[in-house]
């Protein structure tokens, strides 16, 4: 092979390398642009979802429970329907844009029963009432099935939660008095008193029991956050959020949120 042939070969190889290098650069530049466009579309879709649901924005954090547990059910709010139609990357982007940090991570509903077991321990340890008699877990799910589309004002109209002991004590106030009772006191436990005040011991209507105990469950969880957050079973870093509870489904989802994030 002559020196000219060698020179020609080297030039050809260098030319090929240069061509390949340019091609790879073009490929990676295009790949990067595709990724950027994908991210932009994702961000835009999330932004559009938020804008379209501004009037129900406070419920977005609860939508993740709908997506994980009840995506095929009928719901009371438009935002629930629209959220389950989003793919998961867009859902995550929605949470990112709204700076929502409390993200659920579960594949089935076994955690709910586990949280109820923890709650039972706490109620029994603090002698708040006879937990086993009231079947909270069964009534919790039954209330959702029967009443999720009903408005809370209608189904809770008769509840006497602010008429404890004839002193117009709230559940919180009654529980506080109970916590400071003397050893000789014959005060009923707060849960038992709620049941007694609302005559549930004399009512055999399962639907009424279910909806009243759903309400009572929310009161109990509120008290754990307010009065017992030094207990190791209660997450003292729990960040409460507020949204206007209109439907029973709203209350049910808020209770799920509290169970998941409030109890360790």
UniProtKB/Swiss-Prot annotation:
It comes from the Bacteria. The keyword Transmembrane applies. It is a single-pass membrane protein. Keywords: Membrane, Transmembrane, Transmembrane helix. It is found in: Membrane. The chain crosses the membrane at residues 9-29. One of its GO terms (cellular component) is membrane. This is Uncharacterized protein UU061.
